[in-house]
Amino acid sequence: MRRIWLISTIFVFALVSLILIAPLTAGSEPHLARSIYGGFALLCHQLPERSYFIAGHKFAVCARCTGVYAGFAFTFLLYPLLRPLRAIDWPPPVWLVLAAVPMAIDFGLTFFGIWENTHTSRLLTGLLLGGVSVFYVMPGIAELATRKTRAKRPTFTLASSESMASAPSDYSAPDRRI
């Protein structure tokens, strides 16, 4: 199970590193940067006014999504210190909902013009939701990795000549059809 966790952690950090690789390569490798931005555009609005910048180029995702990805990655890294890797039980769903509440409040207050959220508030609410979501994803990975019972393929045998004998037919008497 540790091996699966290690491979998953490398994958998660590789994905998160793309958020920083996009702006760092935007000047020197625009095709690579455009591909990364395009991939993350399917998941994030990427508005410049809501994104962090490096070297004059915006991150591949907004500040809130940066928080979600970063929170997920760092909690994923710390997960073995917090729970057994083989644990396949999920926490009650209410914890995931509660982790999303600050994000919803942050969004809602801005949407209704009560206050203007900041990069920091977006990042922090994203960190919280991303960190909590690991506790719902990792048990699924653990369950898939530790599943030992696989459906066995059915075995086929040739039928004996007795079982292949034909049954009497009712077609000789039309009034007794099934």
Where do the language-model regions lie?
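Short, highly charged, low-complexity non-transmembrane loops/tails of multi-pass membrane proteins
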Residues: T146-D175
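Membrane-interface helix-boundary motifs at transmembrane edges
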Residues: R2, L81-W90
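Small-polar-interrupted transmembrane alpha-helices in polytopic inner-membrane proteins
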Residues: A14-I19, T75, W90-F112
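Membrane-interface loop-to-helix entry segments
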Residues: K58-A73, T120-G131
